[in-house]
């Protein structure tokens, strides 16, 4: 933190995601692990506008494949729309448990409609379908929504392909706060600075980011409205202002302030008013996160002698220790479904992602890297995004909560860190 505060350069603000001239550090994705029992599915080629159809079907296939839960069955040269009769036995014989067919129709005003239908070839029934109005710039978004539909119908869980992620890229002396689709594509810069940017976190509605910027030569917490590019200061007290975390209703932020001495946890309204102290300890309390129901705040504290995860009521009160295995457990992140808690645990000198089942209190290390930090759950609680280091360079890794599915996201030049997975598509 002291090293970061010594950096003294000028900041450049990108007040809208569409601002031209800023380099976009596109993420590339590598699948390094898949689920044990993948669902075989075929996505047939969509007839209609050929260019648009290729974009949509390629996006759907890529989404399903990188999820680690699906095995793509070759469709050969098959191309038919959502209304064509389906020979379920034929596709079942080819090894496909499910099949999706659709079409892309272009209207005179330039807009397009992506239609599709999903079939269960084992039962010989339709699982429903949908139609999405789109245009040339939103074809991949339509593909993500189709993939979400397929994912939910075949797994029973909501898909997260239409969600977005935020992260910070450090390249050529610049810190770029960027937002991208969940697959790393369509990256756009929200803020560019020669000063560090850390701890981005999404508001529950996906419309705002809170983060810490060092542009004032000290850590200050901002809330940034993405649609307009406007932002305001939430916490700029004496000392350090850090680690913002949204309440589930989006009205408050838990923050860490050192204005009264040691770093302690406070809550503050999203407009910066209504400051209230939450923790009272002689140690350092930091990294707060609200539980899914908003009633509890999980945080890191060294009050017991070593960094461990604790929990306290959202309005304060007595804190209870949560982690007991090992001498170093930090960065707690409760799952959106309220069933588990992700955190970083040091095991034999390795900093790894661990997941605790909150009912049984059983802990499982789910990553195989050595320098993990900053975990962030997907909104369906299935995947966890972390920052880690490979070959001396910062990359992002997405790991399933059971450790079986792994993806790696990196940029061609530069370090990428501080990931935050956004909420469901609004």
Curated annotation (Swiss-Prot):
Membrane spanning stretches: none
An example Gene Ontology biological process: cell division
Domain of life: Bacteria
Localization in the cell: Periplasm
Keyword Protease carried by entry: no
GO cellular component: periplasmic space
Signal peptide region: 1-25
S-S bridge residues: none
Chief site of localization: periplasm
Alphabetically ordered keywords of this record: Cell cycle, Cell division, Periplasm, Signal
Subunit structure, as described in the record: The Tol-Pal system is composed of five core proteins: the inner membrane proteins TolA, TolQ and TolR, the periplasmic protein TolB and the outer membrane protein Pal. They form a network linking the inner and outer membranes and the peptidoglycan layer.
Purpose of the protein: Part of the Tol-Pal system, which plays a role in outer membrane invagination during cell division and is important for maintaining outer membrane integrity.
Family: Belongs to the TolB family.
Record protein name field: Tol-Pal system protein TolB
Organism: Dechloromonas aromatica (strain RCB)
């Amino acid at each position: 933190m002291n090293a970061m505060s010594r950096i003294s350069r000028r900041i450049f603000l990108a007040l809208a995601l569409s601002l031209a001239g800023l380099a976009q550090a596109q993420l590339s994705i590598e699948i390094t692990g898949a689920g044990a029992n993948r669902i075989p599915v075929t996505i047939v080629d969509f007839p209609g506008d050929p260019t648009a159809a290729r974009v949509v079907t390629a996006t759907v296939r890529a989404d399903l494949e990188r999820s680690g839960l699906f095995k793509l069955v070759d469709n050969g040269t098959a191309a038919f729309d959502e209304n064509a009769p389906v020979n379920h036995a034929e596709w079942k014989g080819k090894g496909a448990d499910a099949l999706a067919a659709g079409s892309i129709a272009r209207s005179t005003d330039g807009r397009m409609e992506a239609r599709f239908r999903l079939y269960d070839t084992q039962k010989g029934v339709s699982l429903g379908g949908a139609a999405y109005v789109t245009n040339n710039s939103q074809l991949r978004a339509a593909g993500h929504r189709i993939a979400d539909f397929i994912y939910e119908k075949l797994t029973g869980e909501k898909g997260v392909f239409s969600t977005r992620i935020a992260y910070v890229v450090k390249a050529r002396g610049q810190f770029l706060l960027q937002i991208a689709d969940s697959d790393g594509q369509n990256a756009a810069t929200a803020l560019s600075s020669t000063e560090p940017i850390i701890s981005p976190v999404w508001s529950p509605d996906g419309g705002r980011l809170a983060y810490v910027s060092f542009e004032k030569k000290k850590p200050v917490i901002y809330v940034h409205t993405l649609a307009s590019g406007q932002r305001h200061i939430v916490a700029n007290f004496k000392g350090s202002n850090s680690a913002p975390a949204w309440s589930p209703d989006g009205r408050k932020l838990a923050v860490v302030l050192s204005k009264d001495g040691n770093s302690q946890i406070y809550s503050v309204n999203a407009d910066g008013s209504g400051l209230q102290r939450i923790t009272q300890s002689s140690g350092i309390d930091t990294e707060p996160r609200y539980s899914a129901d908003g009633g509890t705040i999980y945080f890191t504290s060294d009050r017991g002698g070593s960094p461990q995860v604790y929990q306290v009521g959202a309005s304060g009160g007595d804190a209870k220790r949560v982690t007991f295995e090992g001498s170093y457990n930090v960065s707690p992140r409760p799952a959106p479904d309220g069933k588990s808690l992700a955190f970083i645990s040091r095991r034999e000198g390795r900093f790894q992602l661990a997941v605790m089942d909150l009912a049984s209190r059983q802990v499982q290390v789910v990553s195989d890297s050595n320098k993990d930090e900053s975990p962030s759950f997907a909104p369906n609680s299935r995947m966890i995004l972390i920052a880690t280091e490979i070959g001396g360079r910062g990359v992002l890794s997405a790991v399933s909560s059971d450790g079986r599915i792994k993806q790696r996201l990196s940029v061609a030049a530069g370090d990428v860190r501080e990931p935050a997975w956004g909420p469901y598509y609004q």
